[in-house]
UniProtKB/Swiss-Prot annotation:
Phosphothreonine: residues carrying this PTM: T186
Species this protein is from: Arabidopsis thaliana
Region: PPI, residue numbers: 333-363
BP term (GO), one: signal transduction
Protein name per its UniProtKB record: CBL-interacting serine/threonine-protein kinase 22
Coiled-coil blocks: none
CDD domains documented for this protein: CIPK_C
Annotated region described as Activation loop, given as residue ranges: 168-197
Enzyme Commission no: 2.7.11.1
Amino acid sequence: MAEDSNSSESIIVNVTGDDNKSALFGKYDLGKLLGSGAFAKVYQAEDLQNGGESVAIKVVQKKRLKDGLTAHVKREISVMRRLRHPHIVLLSEVLATKTKIYFVMELAKGGELFSRVTSNRFTESLSRKYFRQLISAVRYCHARGVFHRDLKPENLLLDENRDLKVSDFGLSAMKEQIHPDGMLHTLCGTPAYVAPELLLKKGYDGSKADIWSCGVVLFLLNAGYLPFRDPNIMGLYRKIHKAQYKLPDWTSSDLRKLLRRLLEPNPELRITVEEILKDPWFNHGVDPSEIIGIQADDYDLEENGKILNAFDLISSASSSNLSGLFGNFVTPDHCDQFVSDESTAVIMRKVEEVAKQLNLRIAKKKERAIKLEGPHGVANVVVKVRRLTNELVMVEMKNKQRDVGLVWADALRQKLRRLINQPVYKVPDKP
């Protein structure tokens, strides 16, 4: 049972035993083993409280985390709680017993992309489809300061519609990890997919490193083999550093040009995500508006996730709220949250009233979310309303630029709190 009904840690389900014999936490019926890794196993399960919907549950042994893997698990929770995108595996809940941590995730029923590409190369048309979906997910992550750092077919899954789902964010880096020189400094990734600048053991740009890995994935999809291969690891690194690869004869001229820019060894000259969106091969046969897909800012306002579960509350709260799992934790956004018993429509109307009083511009608006811009559009705040229960909603205000000294944002925050009832749940500002 939870230790204290008044503590934020009570949101995490902790039980006295390891597993309920009939159903995990009285909710999930564990099924077959889908796979296992260095410190976790993944099972298929049925959500008994949601009509038997199939989910995937990653089970992490806490005792394995004593070997320095705690940061790895913390990072995966921190990253995945930020991400809601159609081509990224959704993490819906985190539960714990005395000995295990359970990640409840969306089940990608189509399996690994790797298993399909190893049996046969893809056509350019199919390669283009998956590359577009990959770039859509990568663009979304980068807009939120998240760099995957281990993009490879084994971490690219397929759903029941054969659409792409990016998974395994255990090696991901966030903007909070960037050094004063503006670079990341941790060597991560799988050798055949790592960018050449990572091999220099100096600082590197996480977004540029991800783009290189996307290039390796695209090469593999089209060719059926990796661009850089050598039985000797140092020989492999030399080929990566010099970008020595041979494209198959069937590769079209436009694809050759794109791969050349993706696998550019100089990160300063490497193609960017925004440039990829304008590339002729990338755009072939599709309306440009369909390619870009969900814009980063637009997805902040999407209805997806409008009903909060326990995991949303844990992960959006202050650092102490995850101590029931494994200690201190850092909240990445400057965020203010409180609970109200007013309707969403009433709250949204009041937000607009306050915005008008403060001369703020409504940049974007949806039923449960609104994006406000200050003078000259130099900063913005997103206000979202998500349902907690039949009677209560959570009002969340995020300063996207994380500028805690923004005067108009502070004024907006104070006015909203006074206007939309006295808050009963408040996330403290990050020190």
